[in-house]
Design a protein with these regions (language model features):
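Well-ordered mid-protein domain cores that form the structural environment of catalytic cofactors
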Residues: 226-242, 246-276, 280
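Bacterial N-terminal signal peptides that target proteins for export
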Residues: 1-11
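Amphipathic hydrophobic-ligand
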Residues: 217-238, 508-521
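Ser/Thr-rich low-complexity repeats and stalk/linker segments
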Residues: 24-34, 39-110
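Beta-strand secondary-structure signal
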Residues: 43-45, 74-76, 87-91, 201-205, ...
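C-terminal motif of bacterial Sec signal peptides marking the signal peptidase cleavage site
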Residues: 18-20
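Outer-membrane beta-barrel proteins
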Residues: 32-36, 78, 225, 347, ...
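Extended, low-charge, aliphatic-rich alpha-helical segments
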Residues: 111-212, 271-615
Length: 615
């Protein structure tokens, strides 16, 4: 569409919307409310309706515009990158008497955005230190059935037709050796998983292996029983970890080469018969020599990757995969927050202190009653994108930023956090109705009489009339990536938060509409009792509060109200922290989190925690 036609179309739409009430109107048509720009300036275009062009003037942020004959206007104004949230207020006044006829206001974000449905790349980090790997070793152990009896079933022939006795070169006594009852057994086995550079070592120790053999003689060779035992058996293997190609929210684990199997303390003991006959002494060593490689080969075959780089895995690799599936954050956290959270892995990095799972992240809202869905209140915004901040993916060490040991770390970038806030606002976050007010002496019911103490024009309303202040976000709160003004872990900015003062009656009567922008510090802490990341809003300076009066049916004097509201709101707005939904952290591997520290690891907001048994 040509620019002129597009402008005329907007004006036509505006006129149609205004028909029926014939009220004067001003509308900012471009850019869209909540849009993003990296330019130093922004061009504001708009139009008026139901007003005499020759008798009105329009100012945007108190800068005069030139009205075209068709009622349209355009003006270029600065975009403040430091503020991020940039409001633009269009005010139409009648020239003849100076009366304000109409207002419109939008916010433009200085910066880039992540479009709805797109991923924030490299935006979530999940760290599992070696101490955390120690915590999941029992889970891996429980998933592997190390059955020596299956490796050497009863009846397996170990030695066949061995010539035990010979006379003048002729064999006069032969022996077969077969696995006997009771079946081969072990007393226990242990697993030690240890992260190394670019791989994870998975070392198994098998204790008290016992194998009973029947030595079956023929000719002059006797028959007897032999018990072989090994104090311990070491089975050492290395494993490579990477995102699963078919479903990258999970970890794919593959054995590197074959496991190395070695015995310590192999012993022999006759259990029956005459096998201490001197002529067959060498037989014992032969059996021991043949049984060891058979057991070694059996264990290697059992524990090796059956098809190399193919889809099948070794038992230990498969068990590690299954255990690590317990740290997928996509489903559990998303459902708890009533959002659709996708976090496919882009890497699994192993180092000598632990392993780090890095994810791209997408958080969206979905209307419905299913898992991860919500039923937003009427009037909730449907936002085109969220504020994005370029940040480097963090590294992790053996200790937290504060130098404390920990088992697990969970970090999220500013961009991913803002996606989460966007999705939650679309689902109703920060919607509230206030029916009480605290002026420093305790909560009081909100009535026309109490509000008249602040806004004298409410004295014209019956003082007993109950009032309600309806708070409605039009945009998502956003984190800028900076620290808060009071040293808090983050800085949060909220744009165009609407407060409508209405009569709380069957048929509401609107008295006042105020748009509020503010800047504050965001605190974060972990509640180990509820297993949630909790948020708080720090103190707010009046200078960090911007207000605009968009509706004034009570006909209050706007100048004094605009001067007084920032101070009043700076005292009330920190309570908004209670409206920020806590971030539920799921259990991992059946273990609960015990908070160690919440801090910025690099740029990421990171929870460091230990894994402890649940109640």
């Amino acid at each position: 569409m040509e620019p002129g036609l597009r402008r005329s179309a907007w004006i036509a739409v505006l006129l149609v919307l205004a028909v029926g009430c014939n009220e004067p109107a001003v509308k900012i048509t471009s850019p869209l409310h909540g849009s993003f720009s990296t330019d130093a300036n922004v061009t504001i275009t708009g139009a008026i309706a139901n007003a005499n062009v020759s008798d009105v003037r329009v100012r945007v942020n108190n800068v005069a515009t030139t009205l075209n004959p068709d009622g349209s206007f355009s003006i270029t104004l600065p975009l403040d990158a430091a503020k991020v949230v940039n409001p633009y207020l269009a005010v139409m006044r009648r020239i003849s008497d100076g009366k304000i006829l109409a207002k419109d206001r939008i916010v433009v974000h200085a910066g880039t955005g992540v479009a709805d449905g797109d991923f924030s790349p490299q935006s979530v980090a999940l760290r599992l230190n070696d101490s955390g790997l120690d915590q999941i070793e029992p889970t891996i152990h429980s998933l592997v059935n190390l059955d020596i009896a299956a490796l050497l079933p009863v009846g397996t022939t170990v030695i066949s037709g061995y010539c035990a006795i010979s006379v003048f070169g002729a064999c006069v006594g032969r022996i077969d050796a077969r696995v006997a009852n009771p079946p081969p057994s072990i007393s226990d086995w242990s697993l030690n998983v240890d992260s190394q550079t670019n791989y994870v070592a998975g070392d198994i120790n098998v204790f008290n292996m016992r194998i009973d053999l029947d030595l079956i003689g023929s000719g002059l060779a006797p028959s007897c029983g032999l018990r072989l035992t090994a104090n311990s058996t070491a089975i050492n293997g290395n494993y490579a970890l990477q995102p699963q190609a078919s479903n990258p929210i999970y970890v794919d684990v593959n054995m590197i080469g074959a496991p190395v199997v070695s015995f310590q303390g192999f012993h022999d003991q006759f259990t029956y018969g005459l096998c201490n006959f001197p002529l067959i002494g060498s037989l014992i060593q032969l059996i021991i020599g043949d049984v060891q490689p058979i057991v070694v080969n059996g264990m290697q075959n059992f524990l090796s990757d059956p098809d190399g780089a193919g889809p099948l895995d070794s038992p230990i690799a498969d068990a590690i995969e299954t255990a690590l599936a317990g740290i997928s954050i996509s489903g559990t956290i998303g459902q708890a927050l009533q959002t659709q959270l996708d976090a496919p892995l882009f890497e699994v990095a192993e180092d000598v202190d632990g392993l780090t799972l890095g994810s791209d992240t997408r958080v969206t809202s979905s209307v419905g009653t299913g898992p991860g869905q919500c039923n937003p209140p009427k009037g909730s915004p449907n936002l085109a994108g969220s504020y994005s901040v370029p940040e480097a993916f963090p590294g992790f060490g053996a200790t937290s930023v504060g130098g404390l040991p920990y088992d697990l770390g969970l970090g999220i970038s500013t961009s991913a956090f803002n996606q989460l806030l966007k999705a939650q606002v679309e689902c109703g976050l920060l919607r509230a109705e206030l029916r009480a007010f605290d002026l420093g002496t305790g909560p009081m019911p909100l009535t026309a009489g109490t509000l008249a103490l602040l806004i004298p024009e409410f004295a014209s309303v019956d003082p007993g009339t109950p009032l309600v202040i309806k708070l409605t976000p039009t945009l998502a709160p956003l984190l800028t990536g900076n620290s808060g003004p009071g040293g808090e872990i983050g800085e949060i900015r909220v744009g165009q938060y609407l407060a409508d003062v209405e009569a709380d009656t069957v048929v509401p009567i609107g008295y006042l509409r105020v748009a509020v922008d503010f800047r504050a510090g965001l605190g974060m802490g972990f509640d180990s009792a509820t297993h949630q990341l909790a948020f708080s809003i720090g103190s707010i300076a009046p200078a960090d509060v911007t207000v605009a009066i968009l509706g004034n049916n009570i006909n209050t004097s706007e100048g004094p109200l605009l001067l007084g509201l920032p101070t009043l709101l700076s005292e009330q707005l920190p309570a908004i922290g209670a409206g920020l939904a806590n971030f539920p952290i799921p259990s991992f591997f059946g273990l609960q989190l015990q908070g160690v520290e919440v801090s910025r690891n690099g740029a990421f907001y990171t929870l460091f925690a230990n894994l402890v048994p649940g109640p």
